[in-house]
C-alpha cells in the first residue's frame, strides 16, 4: 500500500533531504538554497517537538515520525513489515528478494517524474542507500555498509529481478518492460 510505503520511507527520506550542503538541489526547487532541514525543524516545533538546538529538534522530529508509525501499527523497517505481512517467508528470504530488486527500484525512483521536485536531487546510488536504510534500519545498515551516502549500483540483467514481494510481469512482443 502506498501510504504504508511512504511511512516506511519517510524518516530516511527526511534525513536525506535535510542535507545542508547537498551536491545537487532539486531541479524544480522553489528556493535558492537548501531549506529542508529548517522546514523539518519548524514542523517539529509546530507539533511540540523541541530540542536544545536545531539538530536536536530535527532528531526529535525523526523520533516523532517513528513514534507515529508505531502508534498506527506500522513496523519500523521494510523488512519488519514484509515479515509481518508475509510470515511464510523469513527475513533472510525477504532480504535476498529486496537486494535483487533494489538497484532497479533505485533507477525507477530516479526516473520518476516527481524526483526533480525533491529538495535534494539524488543520485541513483543515494536512492539505493535510502531504500536500504529503510529496509534494514540505520543501525543494521551501518553495520552492513558503513555510514555511506551513496552506494554502487549494478545494472540488473534480469527484468524480473525488479519485482519485489513476489510480483512478476510478463515480457512479450506487445509489452515494453513488462507493462502494456
Locate the predicted segments by residue:
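Gly/Pro-rich interdomain helix-loop hinge
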Residues: 3-97, 116, 140, 145-149, ...
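Short, amphipathic C-terminal "tail helix"
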Residues: 95-179
Amino acid at each position: 500500500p502506498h501510504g504504508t510505503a511512504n511511512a516506511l520511507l519517510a524518516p530516511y527520506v527526511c534525513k536525506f533531504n535535510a542535507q545542508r550542503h547537498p551536491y545537487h538541489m532539486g531541479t524544480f526547487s522553489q528556493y535558492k538554497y537548501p531549506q529542508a532541514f529548517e522546514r523539518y525543524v519548524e514542523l517539529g516545533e509546530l507539533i511540540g517537538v523541541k530540542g536544545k538546538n536545531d539538530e536536536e529538534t530535527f532528531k526529535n522530529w525523526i523520533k516523532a515520525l517513528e513514534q507515529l508509525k508505531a502508534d498506527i501499527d506500522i513496523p519500523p523497517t521494510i523488512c519488519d513489515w514484509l515479515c509481518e505481512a508475509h510470515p511464510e517467508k523469513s527475513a533472510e528470504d525477504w532480504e535476498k528478494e529486496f537486494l535483487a530488486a533494489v538497484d532497479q527500484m533505485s533507477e525507477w525512483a530516479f526516473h520518476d517524474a516527481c524526483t526533480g521536485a525533491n529538495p535534494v536531487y539524488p543520485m541513483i546510488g543515494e536512492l539505493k542507500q535510502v531504500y536500504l536504510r529503510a529496509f534494514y534500519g540505520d543501525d543494521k545498515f551501518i553495520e552492513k555498509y558503513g555510514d555511506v551516502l551513496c552506494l554502487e549500483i549494478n545494472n540488473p540483467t534480469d527484468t524480473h529481478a525488479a519485482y519485489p514481494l513476489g510480483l512478476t510481469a510478463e515480457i512479450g512482443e506487445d509489452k515494453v518492460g513488462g507493462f502494456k
